[in-house]
Amino acid sequence: MTKIIQISDTHIVPEGALAYGQVDTAAALAETVATINRLLPQIGPVDLVIVTGDLTEHGTPEEYDRFKMLMADLDLPYRVLPGNHDRREPMRESFADAQWMPRTGPLDWQIDFEDFAVVGLDSLTESAAHGTLEPATLSFLTDALSGLGDKPAIVGFHHPPFAVGIRAMDAQNLHDADSLGTALSLHSGQVRLVCGHLHRSIAGLFSGSLCQVCPGTSHAVTLDQRANAGNSLTKEPGGMLLHEWRDDGFLTHLIPVGAFPGPYPFLGVS
């Protein structure tokens, strides 16, 4: 049974700094890694961790080095995708020793497992907050899905392809979603879309497939759907998603970050 864990929006800043003057994102990522390692005996084996963008706050080499240092304690392999806070070339350089990191062009990749493949797409628009899929990325996706036949696929990228009612964030979603839908429609197998960016657990249908948005590891985008709402964060607990193939379909679990009391046996249950 193939399983992957998704984390997103770690927003690592330089040592001694707080993201937005409020959030210790490094401590949150360290706790996320510890949570994953602690849960592995209960949920394993897990094949991969994917990070769906915004690894850093400013996309600097220093921040990528700090991200990698914090992830070094993870007991699983991981792959990353860029978000709007990342910068493509510093990110490429930071992961230059990884065989899966493209040497040129968009930061797209694919990995095949027994039950499904994972296709990672680069939705970064340099110098803008919204997402786009370059023609090279759309071609990469089309070729990847064509090569899979009817094998299921998880397709990961940073920017959600639909609006969620948080107006400031909806303006920053994936702007060429129709092109993505066209590429997905050509695949005969099951597809699960996984994104980040919104720092909340949100699920919706897109092009006939379930799209699951991952919460951030350290803070949430405030759930405020009023027309005049600004863009703000709320210090809600961090979370992650466990995606697995079970029987004949994808299943996703929401896992909070942290250590909690328990487990306690249910009274009267043998």
Positions of PLM-derived features:
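Active-site environment of divalent metal-dependent phosphoester hydrolases
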Residues: 13-15, 57-62, 84-92, 126-129, ...
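Active-site-proximal beta-strand elements of phosphoester/diester hydrolases
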Residues: 2-14, 115-125, 154-157, 209-215, ...
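Extended active-site neighborhood of metal-dependent phosphoesterases/phosphodiesterases
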Residues: 60-146, 179-189, 229-244
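Short glycine-enriched, charge-decorated loop/helix-capping segments at active-site entrances
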Residues: 18-24, 97, 127, 166-173, ...
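Active-site neighborhood of phospho(di)ester-bond hydrolases with catalytic His/Asp-centered motifs
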Residues: 6-8, 47-54, 78-84, 122, ...
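Binuclear metal-dependent phosphoesterase catalytic core
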Residues: 30, 35, 183, 205-270
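His/acidic metal-ligating clusters that form di-metal
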Residues: 32-48, 130-210, 242, 250-251, ...
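N-terminal active-site segment of His-dependent metallophosphoesterases
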Residues: 1-66, 106
